[in-house]
């Protein structure tokens, strides 16, 4: 019984750790998307300032070119993080299912123990002697 309690605690810890990992990845995706939209605004401002919107034009602002490259890198990172997020969510779901299975086993054991204690109490009442249940 104690080993199952330890296993249950371990599984709960595992689920919480995986939940933190999912939250961390979601936070990174949000941050990267925010940075990309900030860069989009900066690119638009720089294009407006220079009056050149064609990236292949010789007078296109160097800052805007660099910002476009950074934005593209951020968006590529977001795409990579989204695949990692899907994988992390899948492992979280698996860990959660495992935890639920362990908790169901614990509930079944607790119910079995109650039944055994009730039987022991009945036997003790019938025989007039206290009856002990092995725990």
Listing of model-derived features with the role each one plays in the protein:
Residues 1-135:
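Charge-rich amphipathic alpha-helical interaction elements
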């Amino acid at each position: 019984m104690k080993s199952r309690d330890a296993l249950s605690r371990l599984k709960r810890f595992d689920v919480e750790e995986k939940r933190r990992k999912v939250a961390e990845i979601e936070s990174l995706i949000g941050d990267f998307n925010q940075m990309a939209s900030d860069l989009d605004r900066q690119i638009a401002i720089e294009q407006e300032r220079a009056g050149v919107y064609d990236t292949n034009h010789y007078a296109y602002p160097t800052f805007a070119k660099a910002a476009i490259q950074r934005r593209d890198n951020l968006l590529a990172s977001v795409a990579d993080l989204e695949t990692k997020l899907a994988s992390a969510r899948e492992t979280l779901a698996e860990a959660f299912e495992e935890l639920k299975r362990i908790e169901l086993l614990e509930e079944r054991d607790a119910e079995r123990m109650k039944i055994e204690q009730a039987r022991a109490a009945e036997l003790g009442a019938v025989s007039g002697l206290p009856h002990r249940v092995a725990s």
